[in-house]
Amino acid sequence: MERIAIIDGNSLINRAYYAMRNPMITKDGIFTQGIFGFLNMMEKIKKDYEPAYMVIAFDLKAPTFRHKAYEGYKAGRRKMPPELAMEVPILKDILRAMNIKQVELEGFEADDLIGTIAKEAESCGMEPLIITGDKDELQLATDITKIILTRKGVSEFDLYDRQAMMDKYGFTPTQFIDFKGLMGDQSDNIPGIPGVGEKTATKLILEYGSVENLIANVDNVKPKGVKAKVEEHAQLAMMSKRLATINTQVPMDIDFAEYKLTEPDYDALIELYSRLEFNRFLKKLNVQRSGGTGSGDPAAKPLAVDAEKLEKVCVREDSQLA
């Protein structure tokens, strides 16, 4: 089963940026620590998991369907610092030079694109690996789809599939959405039920299974204080669950042949690495270009594209979702 690495671009560069104690700045004043950490993370993923395919999903500034459904969605979240904002377009240039596909779509978050690609990949017989620092994406875990969640900066990860979710939380990845619907999410300003925290939300999910079933059986809820909260804020819980649910049916074209890892544009990449003063990456790239393998990174090996195999890989156009 071939693997596809689906990376949450905004989440990972943000974590990489804040993981560095001291800023990295070139002599020309370009901040680079977010890019540097992101590239290190990509190297680790390629080395440890050897994906045949890779795609990076990014958020756009435009409001999404969640902002339209709830005006307060993500209100109060701190803005990206200008130093990090400076790094994002440079990272995208590097990814283009690497011939790694990037996806973004107005009206949707990167989470939704990731969920849609992962679901399609699994249906095509691939093994999706979702790399993120966002716990929201744990709801996408299955027996096949794995979530690689950054634990400390971007150098340490926890791996989740459906069973790992059950072991840690006691409920399924799908029920993780109900869990967030009850307790909310401060980082996204999803309200949940006021006064219901992690412990109570877990107890209610384990007992009733879903927000809908909890509301339908509210007369049986104990203690009375929790019952009163559920009765009063039932609609808020339902809205919160909708906000927390990742859309896995985004109308987008998916052609896995475009996600195949291939050789980079060496000249473009060397120019970018030189400007960013990434000497270690430059040295490794030169070894790769001369036919070496760098430090054992499978991405440094020429990846031949099997045309016959690619013809069998799913290609989905958004018109097929009608």
Report residues per predicted region:
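Noncatalytic, basic helical substrate-engagement surface that gates or grips nucleic-acid strands
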Residues: 1-131, 135-162, 236-239, 245-253, ...
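Conserved DEDDh/DEDDy metal-dependent 3′-5′ exonuclease domain
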Residues: 53, 107-109, 133, 309-322
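A short, flexible N-terminal coil/short beta segment enriched in small residues
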Residues: 75-78, 285, 318-322
